[in-house]
Amino acid sequence: MSIELTNLFDEFDRGRLSRRQLLQALGIAVALRPAAAFAQGQCGGARAGTPECDPTPAKLPFEPTGWNTVLLDHFSCQVADYPKEAAYYAALMNWKIRSDDGKQAVLDIGDWGGLVLRGGFQAPPPPPASDAPPAGGRGGGPRAPRNAAFDGFCWGIDAWDAKKVETALRTRGLTPVADNHGDFQSFHVKDPDGFDLQISNGNRKNRRQGPATGQTTAPAPFETTSWKTVWLDHISFEVSNYKETAAFYHALLGWKLGTDEGSQNQCEIGDIGDIIIRRGGGGNRSAAPSARPPARRAAMGHISFGIAGFEPDAVKGELTRRGLTAREDTGGRGDIHTASYKSYHTTTPNGFDLQISATTKANRWA
């Protein structure tokens, strides 16, 4: 789904947009975009093949490292109220809290990934008000900002050798910053948009060993589900130049490039999951030629996690029973009971768009 439409539904889910306003805004959006815009990508229908939707991939920024990504070590997320967010993920997604030191909580995503939640998030000022109903995109009306931002991710690579990794990064024009503690070894670098990329020695044998028995100060917001998170369905990664970013991660971390749709590229992160690297982090496309280009930026618009035994009515019922929204998303492929792609979006206490899907390693290409 395009960023503008995702934001519209996000406002509706949070109660900041009435049903009438949503329908009015959707009428505007549909007039501006083909129906295919409701699915992932912006270059379907009549826009396919236009200059704005050129599917030619970018050249690689440097010689490939030959590394393979073998682990989602952890996501890094800053929120306004981290104990509340941690308690929510623990109850809804059944992620175990490994630790909470009063400044951040570390959670296990199933037995294959991690999440570090930090406090201290300061929301940016809202955009100027407008008489039009909130459109959720450039030039739209007032929209309260999220109180959460995923601002980094850490990936474990195979055949770790700290000196060789540092040399490989420097010879490719990157500036690695070591971040080590105990058996944990890593380097931070910046991607083309300045996003914090951490590369580590993490693998399934040296991470998340032993039971996670931590607690956070916030109470559980509702009864815990029995869901098991088994797959990283996709990260929606909105960047300034998706072609450059896709080429960067392909060359550096070995992520397999998908078909360039003209506005995004869905890449495979080994046997961990997928990432949709998409247009949306700037670019100043509508500005005058003389205008100063904006600072490049990247953001995770949403993250979709696959759970075991996904059954549409049961999942929706669990969300509704807990007072949570459940916005259906089949990627434009029809009824959720028969579509090949099945998922629901909901919103975390700090306002992040969490997607829960039926996608697993076994059906990732369905």
Where are the predicted features?
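N-terminal secretory signal peptides
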Residues: M1-L17, Q21, I28-V30, G41-Q42
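Vicinal oxygen chelate
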Residues: I3-F9, V79-A86, A91, R146-D193, ...
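N-terminal beta-strand motif that seeds the catalytic metal site of vicinal oxygen chelate
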Residues: T6-R14, G44-P83, G113, F150-I157, ...
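Core segments of cupin and vicinal oxygen chelate
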Residues: R16, A25-A31, C77-P124, D179, ...
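Conserved short beta-strand elements that form part of the metal-binding/catalytic scaffold
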Residues: C43-F62, K96-A148, A159, D196-R204, ...
